[in-house]
Amino acid sequence: RQGRVSTLPPGVEVLRCWRNQLLTLSSETNCLTLYDAHDYPLVTLPAGIRPCGCAVVDCQVIVCGCEDGCLHIFSLPDLREIAVYPVPGCPMRVAADGGVLTCLSLLSPDPPQTLLFRLCLTSGDFAPVALLPGWCGAVTIADDHTIWAGVGEQLLHFPLDSVVPDVQLGEFGLIRFLSCQQSKLLISDPWAGRCLLMDTTPPYAPCQLYAGECGGCCFASCRKGTLPDWKASLNEP
């Protein structure tokens, strides 16, 4: 498979693929940019103040505006802003599950406190889940619609419709990205310089995939019902 190297604008916080195009969010330029298949910028639009998180769902992208205190919804591919939702604090991370957004928002920097909440795009209803000590790390939604969140030095799991975590794991740096697929949780922990893979069922034992300087990682595309043989790949030289 042919590789691809792209030149990106400064301060890129998030990279996302949409069809065969690349979407970037920069906290330095405060802009969301869509590139074509040849890395030519097609559209660039302002998106918040020091934005640092986004999620792509079908033909929409949800951006955490961070210091402007809003979640912004843009249509794809024209990046037209179609909705703005003011929320408490500085929204920094977001994950989408159908028409419901799950977000992490920094309420206080000293000491750091993070609000985990859900927002229904259809009704606009806001539902706080938990107020947690520590900085915003990452959030993702599992296949069973439950929440995995990294806040401070902890990784937490919230069952469906619960405001109390049933799993609390420590000894992380500050998790930057989480990705859940087929009962596997991929954990990017750049402060600790590692990427981990963990089953979403007990005994919750993270397996280190990579150690070193690491900005993030994600699952590659694969056929439904299949995942790479992680154990075999870890044994390769």
Predicted regions and their residues:
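A short beta-strand motif characteristic of beta-propeller blades
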Residues: Q2-L8, D39-P46, R80-Y85, G124-L131, ...
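Repeated scaffold domains used in trafficking and secretory/extracellular systems
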Residues: P10-W18, I49-V57, G89-D97, P133-A142, ...
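Conserved beta-strand positions in repeat-built beta-propeller and related beta-rich domains
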Residues: T24-E28, V63-G69, C103-P111, A149-E153, ...
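Inter-blade boundary loops/turns of WD-repeat beta-propellers
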Residues: S27, A37, L76, L119-L121, ...
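Blade-level signature of beta-propeller repeat domains, shared across WD40, Kelch, NHL, RCC1
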Residues: S188-P237
